């Protein structure tokens, strides 16, 4: 069924009846509402079949890197301002759940249908009734390189209330389409910092469903999960921001405002998926 949906999407795009890029004309610029809760609610999603430390390979244009849940758990240890949830799909495959549950505040087992977005969606449901707070959605593919980043990211968001979501890597186009020269800017979904208010607006604009929920086909999931969530933030009138080793860049759906390399940013760095402090 997912493959059929993907084919329909591709056909509609080819004839010009559907667009991944939701456009920028007519979008009214907005600013986020201030947070009311000082805690940062973090979700780390993991697949139960992964070892605690692993090597990540994408393709020949992107450097391989070391990553894993071990490094993500270490990243947030001893942070009194963080409430940490680990979500895991196919949890029956893991031999480490007993240890993991001692290193986080909450553990949620989820189906693998939707992959990361299955975990993100379940996590959102668990916190949706809270006061407005900062929310970080991330997974275990983040580079093992450690840095003290969170305070600088929160400070940046506080100073830049026009930013609805912040990431650490991005892409200027959709590769899962027949339209080759498309401009579809989006953050890559292994690290997304936002607020509960913005996330709630995103879900509402997506028909009450968390983007990517229930999708198994990886190409369709990138389109309706990773790309869709960024495009919804932009459609709401916020900007996106990305932190790389070269600094912070804001962007929207206007190609004239794009200042980053075209394509997948990870092809232009020797530290893909790394978190760099501001």
Please name every model-derived segment:
Residues 1-278:
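ER/Golgi luminal nucleotide-sugar-dependent glycosyltransferases, focusing on the catalytic module
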């Amino acid at each position: 069924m997912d493959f059929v949906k993907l084919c329909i999407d591709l056909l509609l795009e080819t004839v010009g009846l559907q667009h991944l890029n939701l456009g920028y004309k007519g979008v009214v610029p907005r600013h986020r509402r201030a947070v009311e809760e000082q805690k940062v609610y973090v979700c780390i999603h993991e697949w139960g079949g992964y070892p605690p430390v692993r090597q990540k390979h994408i393709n020949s244009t992107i450097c391989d890197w070391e990553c894993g849940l071990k490094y993500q758990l270490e990243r947030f240890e001893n942070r009194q301002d963080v409430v940490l949830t680990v979500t895991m799909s196919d949890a029956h495959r893991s031999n480490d759940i007993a240890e993991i549950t001692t290193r986080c505040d909450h553990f949620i087992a989820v189906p693998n249908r939707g992959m990361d977005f299955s975990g993100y969606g379940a996590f959102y449901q668990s916190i949706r009734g809270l006061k407005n707070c900062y929310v970080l959605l991330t997974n275990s593919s983040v580079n093992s390189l450690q840095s003290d980043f969170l305070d600088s990211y929160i400070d940046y968001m506080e100073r830049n209330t026009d930013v609805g979501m912040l990431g650490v890597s991005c892409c200027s186009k959709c590769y899962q389409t027949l339209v080759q020269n498309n401009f579809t800017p989006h953050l890559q979904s292994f690290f997304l910092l936002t607020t509960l208010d913005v996330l709630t607006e995103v879900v509402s604009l997506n028909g009450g469903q968390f983007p990517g929920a229930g999708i198994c086909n990886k190409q369709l999931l990138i389109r309706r999960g990773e790309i869709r969530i960024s495009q919804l933030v932009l459609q709401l009138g916020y900007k996106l921001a990305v932190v790389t080793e070269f600094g912070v860049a804001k962007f929207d759906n206007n190609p004239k405002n794009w200042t980053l390399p075209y394509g997948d940013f990870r092809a232009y760095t020797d530290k893909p998926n790394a978190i760099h402090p501001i």
